Amino acid sequence: MLYPQHFDVIVVGGGHAGTEAALAAARMGCKTLLLSHNIETLGQMSCNPSIGGIGKGHLVKEVDALGGAMAAATDEGGIQFRILNSSKGPAVRATRAQADRLLYKAAIRRRLENQPNLWLFQQAVDDLMVEGDRVVGAVTQAGIKFRAKTVVLTAGTFLDGKIHVGLNNYAAGRAGDPPAVRLSARLKELKLPQGRLKTGTPPRLDGRSIDFSKCGEQPGDGMPGGMSPVMPVFSFMGRVEQHPPQMSCWTTHTNERTHEIIRSGFDRSPMFTGKIEGVGPRYCPSVEDKINRFADKDSHQIFLEPEGLTTNEYYPNGISTSLPFDIQYALVRSMAGLENAHILRPGYAIEYDYFDPQQLKSSFETRAIGGLFFAGQINGTTGYEEAAAQGLFAGVNAALQAGAQTSWQQETWVPGRDEAYLGVLVDDLITKGVTEPYRMFTSRAEFRLQLREDNADMRLTETGRRLGLVDDARWEAFSRKREAVSRETERLRSLWVSPKNLTATESERVLGKSIEHEYSLADLLRRPDVNYANLMSLEGGKYASAELNIPVSRETPAVPLPEAVFAAVVIEQVEIVAKYAGYIDRQIEEVGRAAHYENLKLPLELDYLQVSALSFEARQKLSKHRPETLGQASRLSGITPAAISLLLVHLKKSNFKGFAAAGKVTAPSESGDVQQGVI
């Protein structure tokens, strides 16, 4: 039957990508339908019980700055919080949280069920309704047809999924869930380029059978013995009192006996016997892959992570495996503290279809089928955080195409590489594609000094407001913070000290040496050995801000007052901006030089095969990938700065719109530097 109600946006799949996509489209005012094979598993953490980490935490903060759910759900479900790289610069500091699976899933479900404009429906999708070259809806396994203006596919590992344990394998989307075989076949019928990838998960352990006295304890920040006495929050709107009771993680190690056991199972490993065709994640390898690749290492650290407050289940992070169960049993029991460990669920690898993200437009709409958007593992990525960010992004663009009424004046929203890690993620996928599951690192962002966790709201919340993603409460909180940062920055610039009014003793106490001429407090704060608190102690606190002079205790994990938290956040932002101003200014100059190419749209009718000045390889790659801008073209593998210059010459001679007036140009080199050239 044809369902009588029509929708603006249909989202297929209720994982981390699907839930963020559906919430985003609904927040923008679109009538949105979320289809899932099982609404009891909406927001389920299929693998590890954690959110965030290096690069990944940055994405979560960006999703949150745009009104997304992941960070807020983690604050409500997180049972351990840590700031990674806390001793390093702010650009690479990252929040990571262990989450109670049930609490996290419940927090996501609650948001979905209370979101206006959002409908849930439990049915697996087997087919897409396509008219001409445009999608117009989806068909469920029961034959129910739902019509919509746009469709977002977020199928995760379900597309023709196959689970491997040793030499045994069976069809599944994940353990306990059926695969989406018919939907995968339908996508292949549409001639969308696809491949196979794989990922894996470790066996789960019963905590009652673990001897924790033989393991190392790893408490979180704000817990007794933690690295910091201050407990973090993930969301910009989060509060520490939202966190449930906290738990420690634990560590153990593999040993030579463990490695011998693993090697003894290589002849029955689906990885080494050719049973698995898909490529696995380089940065989250299986334990058998680690032992094979790093044969010189005699030990690997394993983290025992609690799955929740109401379960004894533990996730042994570091021993993801598809080895036969008898090998899994033996390798687990070969480690200290796990000699009597009981396995609750076996580890496994899962192989699944993905579709080449280079066939997507920059909005994540497929080039072949109008109105069809992809997000998450279907694009070749791995990780909850990468999926959530893509889901929000695809949901926004699907909503814009469906006619969302917002103050955004453009047909699509695509953040630049200098604006967000989400922009880096999108650009990497559509220009470089994937040959293995893609995960985010801070090293992928050339402008990472600007793309910090602490300023994700400063970068994106105003855009989110224009897109209709940000509610009044978040907007008011953000505006208050932004105004306070601006006021304090200007105040520090306006206050001056000189040798006349600052004694040498006082100067040496705070600044390390006496000053020789007049300085503003903003200038002094730029010094690496001067922090805000010390600066405000000058002359008995004479220069302290009445607005921000609220003490925050760092001696105990007690919950500080909201005003003290606000003051600490503002002070952190003021101090970081002051200390990194020179570096950030240089990056802004680089962004400006590159912006010319990002704004030069390549003509849709351009036949690259006829640009005879280009090498055959360059013509082939440009024809295949059809980059939307000159900036995208410059980042394609095999496209050199010389090729970009030659392409510019051709465009100018051919009088394509926007290129006829080109004169002196700056062609980006493969290293990202800028080279001067003339055409």
From Swiss-Prot:
Matching InterPro entries: FAD/NAD-bd_sf, GIDA_C_N, MnmG, MnmG-rel, MnmG-rel_CS, MnmG_C, MnmG_C_subdom, MnmG_C_subdom_sf
Residues that, per the record, bind FAD: G13, G14, G15, H16, A17, G18
Residue numbers binding NAD(+): 280-294
Keyword ATP-binding (UniProt): no
UniProt-listed SUPFAM superfamilies: FAD/NAD(P)-binding domain (SSF51905)
Cofactor(s), by name: FAD
A Pfam family assignment: GIDA_C_1st
GO cellular component: cytosol
Gene3D superfamilies, A to Z: FAD/NAD(P)-binding domain, GidA associated domain, C-terminal subdomain, tRNA uridine 5-carboxymethylaminomethyl modification enzyme MnmG/GidA
Biological processes per GO annotation: tRNA methylation; tRNA wobble uridine modification
GO molecular function, one term: flavin adenine dinucleotide binding
Domain of life of the source: Bacteria
Compartments where found: Cytoplasm
The entry's keywords: Cytoplasm, FAD, Flavoprotein, NAD, tRNA processing
Subunit structure: Homodimer. Heterotetramer of two MnmE and two MnmG subunits.
Family annotation (PANTHER family): GLUCOSE INHIBITED DIVISION PROTEIN A, PROTEIN MTO1 HOMOLOG, MITOCHONDRIAL
Role description: NAD-binding protein involved in the addition of a carboxymethylaminomethyl (cmnm) group at the wobble position (U34) of certain tRNAs, forming tRNA-cmnm(5)s(2)U34.
Family according to the record: Belongs to the MnmG family.
Name of this protein: tRNA uridine 5-carboxymethylaminomethyl modification enzyme MnmG
Species: Albidiferax ferrireducens (strain ATCC BAA-621 / DSM 15236 / T118) (Rhodoferax ferrireducens)
Gene from which this protein is expressed: mnmG
